Amino acid sequence: MKIPFFDRNKMLLKKYSKIVEKIKRREERFSKMSNQELINVALEFRKISDPQNHIEDIFAMVRVAAKRTLGMYPFDVQLIGALVLNDGKIAEMKTGEGKTLVATMPLFFNALFGKGVHLVTVNDYLARRDALWMGPLYLFLGMRVGVINQLGKSYEVVWKNQELYEKAISDNLSIWPEDYKNEFLKESAKDRKAVEAFEVELIEITRKEAYVCDITYGTNNEFGFDYLRDNLVFQFDDKVQRGHFYAIVDEVDSILIDEARTPLIISGPSREGASVYRRFASIAKKMSKDIDFTVDEKSRTIILTDKGIEKSEKLLQVDNLYDPSNVSSVYHLLNALKALHLFKKDVDYVVMNQEVVIVDEFTGRLLPGRRYSGGLHQAIEAKEGVPVKEESVTYATITFQNYFKMYEKLAGMTGTAKTEEEEFKQLYDLEVVVIPTHKPMIRKDHDDLIYRTQAEKYTAVVNDVVERYKKGQPVLIGTTSIEKSELLSTMLKKAGIPHQVLNAKYHEKEAEIIAQAGQKGAVTIATNMAGRGTDIKLGEGVADLGGLCIIGTERHESRRIDNQLRGRSGRQGDPGESRFYLSLEDDLLRIFGADQLEKVMNVLKIKPGEPIEHPLLTKLVETVQKRVEGINFSIRKHLMEMDTVLDVQRNSIYSYRDWILSGKVSQYIDEAIEDFVERRIEEFCDGSEWNLEGLKNSLSVLPKDVVSIDSQKFDSEGQMKDFLIRSIKDAYERKRQEIGDEYDQFLKFLILRIIDDNWRQYLEEVDHVKEAVNLRVYGQRDPMIEFKKETFALFDEMIARINEIVVSWMLRVVKVDSKKAEQEAKSGLSNLQLVHEEFNIVNRSERRKLHKNEKIKKRFKVKR
């Protein structure tokens, strides 16, 4: 409940400001120490049992050490940001306010607990850059720093020249000269000897060693995939992560919100043939938009009409399209139609070297190796006429929401979080604290200019750029797709304006290009937020020209993404300006609000090429964005609710695996035998009438000599149960003695393989259930409750199936080769790949169409 006139942000800032004053008072003591004394104190702090009682001293020490080793002195507002992160909250700090430095204090503090801490960022480049940049500070204070990158590459930060470093310690060198009094240390004023002595580099190490380091830098994807891979291993020692204690998520809005609809998936090839996808691609082309189906761009779904259903049945030669036996046909048809009408070349993906490569919708980067799951990627390949690769089968999956919820303490930092504070609170229980800027923000944010057509809009953008280029003012133009960035580039070339294009096709140089975007006369086109995390410093004389000008060519679905673009200008009190150029043909306005604006333009008799501009119109656009944000929030919440159900089951399966990996095979076998027997007693011996024939048939999965109930008499269910359990356990013990020591080792690999195969099959079934339960909303049933009931029933079936297979197979083993068993168990993991999933929620219209088919069975059953 919000209390009127109560500003919690102000209250928190006041609280943290008091702690900052204490830190500053403690700092004097540390600033008088020599380098060696400071190092010794840091070592002493590692021995204390509760660092929380020494937080002011620890932060003061890190502040002094940063000045000496990095030539950077954290401001008071940066100390506030560090305290916010240390309390497990989100610090909103504007671009250029030094978030990288802010993170060092809470990272060092929490690393003192000895459990390992993680700094999570959005790409490999930033992980390496920030670890190297802050590395001298951590190494000076006795911390090991690791970096994890894609393709299994891992590094440790080490001193470049150990001898020079040791001399710098004994000679008490500092990068920041004692007589330098300004708050920023200029490059020219740094002590060159100290700079050279405190240089670091990366050396390659194993993945496991990177996690053993006190502080580990890496991307959200790599941390998540390492967790999933750890739960596919066949030896406990092959696990690389050592737990989830404390993490700071850099660009937290990008990772926990923008990418929250994108589950991490480890998948492998399926048996579905390429010809199936080509067939459905051909059928999709015979279907007419708005007659056979409608396209809902808001929820990215295709809805078949009654005519479309009839036409599909004729084309597929089936009586009832929605009969359960035709589920896969519906699945393929909808995917083929989505590929044709919802996924656009050079916007959602590009075709390179006969391959479909996904474009990240938030950063504009290419994602080679990533594939849409559920057959969608293959449908796009069939549409584009490139070789169709096998459909992927899910081996392991987790959403970022549930991965990051595993951390005992989670914090985040970004320049834009306030607009999403409700979502952070509801989904992650994370509070947003807005940190004041070190210097006042003086950037001018102009009202939007709205044109009738995109052609008029782009012409106006080019004219604006030409005028600013003539006077030397740098311009950064933000676009929403590769296609649009290349269109603008062509127009600027015709106008004779030299410029740089920064998008998915050139991302290797993006940090270098974006860093130069503030130089005099620079014109840069950037796809969305490519180059995020890199500061744009103004060149000489640029401040007098008005600073960096940001031009947005389209409003994003989220106000936050627009604010990120604006935030590239006006860093640390620099001048700057921003403006968005829009048109009624832009996706956001076309889908959600063009009609109202069209009426306004007609009333005002706006001529072709003329824009309308008014603060009320800018607010109207923001209102449209709020509506879209609400829709997207609901989708993310729905995804999280579904994955939370899965999370309980995933934890249960992974706990089973860990139990078996740690050598508890015989204990697991005991449990499996008991479960195997109890289920049969419940089914065949419940009550006064026993179905002994049914029981005998169900026991036929065991070798004949294991158990016989023909000559036995039982007075109760308990007696029967005890007899069966004892008989099977005796057979297990005989088999152990017969085969010897290798038997349990062999069983370990066998059990893990059985668990993994069934879990993989279960995840595939859950994908179908997600679609199926949504059909039931018209039976006055809540899809979420139905999803829980359905998945719990399937999960219980899976556990029963696992135990039955284990119990029956373990007693049929004749000869054992545990090494061969391990190789066989691991063989399926060699072709695994990382998948970017397009998460689909069937909307009401589609469910209504499906519900018309009377032949749909009440229970959605997946063939096994």
Curated annotation (Swiss-Prot):
Subcellular location: Cell inner membrane; Cytoplasm
KW Cytoplasm (keyword) present: yes
Any one annotated GO CC term: plasma membrane
Record EC number: 7.4.2.8
Membrane topology note: Peripheral membrane protein
Chief subcellular location: membrane
A Pfam family annotated for this UniProt entry: P-loop_SecA
Catalysed reaction, written as an equation: ATP + H2O + cellular proteinSide 1 = ADP + phosphate + cellular proteinSide 2
GO BP term, example: intracellular protein transmembrane transport
EC class: translocase
SUPFAM superfamilies found in the cross-reference section: Helical scaffold and wing domains of SecA, P-loop containing nucleoside triphosphate hydrolases, Pre-protein crosslinking domain of SecA
Keywords: ATP-binding, Cell inner membrane, Cell membrane, Cytoplasm, Membrane, Nucleotide-binding, Protein transport, Translocase, Translocation, Transport
GO molecular function (one): protein-exporting ATPase activity
Keyword Membrane: yes
Residues reported to bind ATP: Q78, G96, E97, G98, K99, T100, D535
UniProt xrefs under SMART domains: SecA_DEAD, SecA_PP_bind
InterPro entries: Helicase_ATP-bd, Helicase_C-like, P-loop_NTPase, SecA, SecA_CS, SecA_DEAD, SecA_motor_DEAD, SecA_preprotein_X-link_dom
Function of the protein: Part of the Sec protein translocase complex. Interacts with the SecYEG preprotein conducting channel. Has a central role in coupling the hydrolysis of ATP to the transfer of proteins into and across the cell membrane, serving as an ATP-driven molecular motor driving the stepwise translocation of polypeptide chains across the membrane.
PANTHER family for this protein: CHLOROPLAST PROTEIN-TRANSPORTING ATPASE (PTHR30612:SF0), SECA INNER MEMBRANE COMPONENT OF SEC PROTEIN SECRETION SYSTEM (PTHR30612)
Assembly mode: Monomer and homodimer. Part of the essential Sec protein translocation apparatus which comprises SecA, SecYEG and auxiliary proteins SecDF. Other proteins may also be involved.
Similarity comment: family membership: Belongs to the SecA family.
Protein name: Protein translocase subunit SecA
Protein's gene: secA
